[in-house]
């Protein structure tokens, strides 16, 4: 197999961001506007901007004091999502074989890149990860032109799907989440919906290439 270039999102794909963010919002504000049992509800959150249930001042204070500020370690403390460790173990093996692996995220914070690199190593076992921090994912993907792109944000995936003619060899995958199911029917043919990053890698046949090397 020729070497591939893989670009993987973090929050909602490998890291459990929403649950941690919700807990910080409630702890800092003393408010509890979320539906009962949200922590174990597989259909939560139903929308991308669920945090609007909290007042704007609360959200602003949390981002400034508990997330963006140096040494708060918000990103470092996030829990991995199910199958995240298996996915990153596979990505590590692919990187050893010479494939290019990039983690692309729109996270914010004074030391967010360092926290993210440490998280990938400490929580998922990925040494020396290549982490790109950018809110302009579309432009980063346009520049990298990867063979596989995986994200959970519908607007990002659909924006790339509209211009899929630019990247005829790129596989675009949307990780299925409750908040990204309002999909434009005419674009569904231009990307693949998967249950996890691991599933995206498996569907691309990348797990079989690693298994062949291990068995030989």
Give the predicted meaning of each segment.
Residues 93-96, 182, 193-216:
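Charged phosphate-binding loop/patch that engages nucleotide di/tri-phosphates or the phosphate backbone
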Residues 53-72, 99:
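Short, basic/glycine-rich phosphate-binding loops at helix/coil junctions
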Residues 129-135, 188-200:
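Short acidic-hydrophobic, aromatic-tinged amphipathic segments that line or gate anion-handling sites
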Residues 106-162:
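Substrate-recognition "cap/lid" segment bordering the active-site pocket of phosphatases
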Residues 149-195:
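Acidic, Mg2+-coordinating phosphoryl-transfer loop and its flanking beta/alpha structural elements
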Residues 140-142, 181-188, 203-205:
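Short, charged, surface-exposed secondary-structure boundary motifs
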Residues 69-103, 110-114:
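Short, acidic loop-to-helix structural element flanking the phosphoryl-transfer center
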Residues 1-62:
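Active-site neighborhood of HAD-like aspartate-dependent phosphohydrolases
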């Amino acid at each position: 197999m020729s070497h591939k270039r893989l670009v993987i999102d973090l929050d909602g794909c490998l890291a459990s961001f929403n649950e941690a963010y919700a807990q910080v919002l409630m702890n800092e504000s003393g408010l509890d506007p979320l539906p009962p049992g949200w922590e174990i509800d597989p259909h939560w959150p139903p929308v991308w901007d669920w945090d609007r249930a909290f007042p704007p001042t609360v959200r602003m204070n949390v981002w400034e004091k508990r997330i963006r500020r140096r040494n708060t370690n918000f990103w470092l403390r996030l829990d991995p999502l199910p199958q995240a460790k298996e996915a990153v173990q596979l990505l590590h093996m692919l990187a050893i074989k010479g494939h290019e692996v990039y983690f692309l995220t729109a996270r914010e914070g004074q030391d967010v890149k360092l926290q993210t690199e440490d998280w990938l190593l400490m929580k998922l076992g990925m040494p020396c990860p290549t982490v790109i921090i950018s809110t302009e994912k579309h432009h980063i993907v346009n520049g990298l032109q990867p063979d596989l792109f995986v994200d959970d944000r519908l607007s990002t995936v659909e924006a790339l799907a509209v211009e899929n003619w630019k990247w005829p060899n790129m596989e675009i995958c949307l990780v299925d989440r409750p908040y990204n199911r309002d999909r434009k029917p005419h674009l569904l043919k231009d990307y693949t919906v998967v249950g996890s990053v691991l599933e995206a890698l498996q569907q691309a046949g990348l797990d079989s290439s690693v298994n062949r090397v291990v068995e030989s």
